[in-house]
Amino acid sequence: MTTAFYHDERCLWHSWGEAVLTLPVGGYVQPPAGTSHLENPETKRRFKNLLEVSGLWDHLDVRKADPVTVEDILRVHTQPYVDLFRETSANGTAAPGKTRLMLPGSFESASLSAGLVKRAVADVLSRSVRNAYALARPPGHHAEPVAGTGFCLLANIAIALEAARAEQGSLRVAVLDWDVHHGNG
């Protein structure tokens, strides 16, 4: 059985706008290439392209998914946050939260990103695939119930697991977040 790979180019259309996070260069901090935001679609496109040119792409079971529903999101995030996120994404006039910006289309991209993770989890739990990888963007591992943080807008894995729990009842899983940095992670 091959590895299922969940990807949708539309997830990469999310933009942080002109916001650029800069860190002092030196020590172990490399100068940024250009003025793009640290969390940007090119790193994910590069990963996908490497899979293709290496020939590994041909051994993957490439799949797509539908966006998560608002009902799915509300199992993890608060109604005020979801309302603010949807409004901000529709007009792009505010930057609620701690370390991220929401622009037009952010809600749709984040919902689709979480949808990829939800489908990956559902397919593994149903044993229709043995293992899965979701190339999901924007990421979700730092998002909190009341706010997006750390460039994460929706808590993708939490949304996927709560959706699975709602469908299957009791669910026992382990989540390993391998993200090497200080703070929320």
Region locations from a protein language model:
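HDAC/HDAC-like amidohydrolase catalytic core signature
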Residues: 1-176, 180-185
